[in-house]
């Protein structure tokens, strides 16, 4: 059973999605120093269910994603880490908090490209891009450009569509826990469509009702 250094965050990391961190807390600086001695250099990311990223004492969801370290820079100030989401896992047991969080994990089964319905994949892409395009017309900041380039691999693309979808963290966590790729695509379409209806309804209210 793999033992993995863990970095709980206030956001969800999906496979095939980038992750940029500014690390300043002492225990995570120690963690980064430790994992750089391993190949591949990786750690686990789980969503914090209750609590804060800094200081410990938080409660965490049990399904997360491994992050492979691509680059580390140490300018004057916090450590800057660039990583990429790789494989999903389930936490079996938290085994340590010092010198940094660690957990026994089991990897979740990877999806197969042959299982991807290309029609559903195309619909998910048009739905997510459509929602981003609508939000771009409002005075709202969106984390991803509407014309963002996605992977050619259908599994990676499905995860990336979930990752860039304009949803809250709990919706993202639900998508991360998808039991199969067809579920991932259908629920991405459904959840983003429902969110878009909410966005439009809120934006269509008269100014004195918003």
Model-derived features: where do they sit?
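N-terminal low-complexity, acidic/polar interaction/targeting segments
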Residues: 1-210
């Amino acid at each position: 059973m793999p033992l993995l250094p863990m970095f709980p965050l206030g956001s969800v990391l999906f496979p095939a999605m980038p992750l940029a961190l500014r690390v300043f807390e002492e225990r995570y600086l120690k963690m980064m120093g430790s994992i750089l001695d391993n190949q591949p250099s990786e750690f686990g990311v789980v969503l914090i269910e209750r609590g804060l990223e800094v200081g410990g004492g938080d409660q965490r969801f049990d399904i997360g994603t491994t992050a492979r370290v691509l680059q580390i820079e140490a300018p004057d100030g916090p450590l800057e880490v660039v990583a990429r989401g790789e494989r999903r896992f389930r936490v079996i047991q938290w085994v340590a908090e010092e010198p940094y969080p660690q957990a026994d994990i089991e990897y979740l089964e990877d999806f197969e490209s042959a299982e991807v319905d290309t029609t559903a994949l195309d619909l998910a892409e048009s739905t997510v891009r459509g929602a981003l395009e609508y939000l771009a017309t409002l005075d709202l900041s969106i984390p991803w450009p509407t014309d963002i380039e996605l992977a050619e691999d259908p599994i990676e693309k499905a995860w990336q569509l979930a990752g860039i979808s304009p949803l809250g963290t709990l919706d993202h966590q639900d998508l991360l826990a998808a039991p199969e790729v067809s579920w991932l695509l259908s629920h991405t379409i459904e959840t983003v469509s429902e969110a878009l209806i909410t966005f439009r309804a809120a934006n269509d209210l008269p100014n004195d009702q918003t």
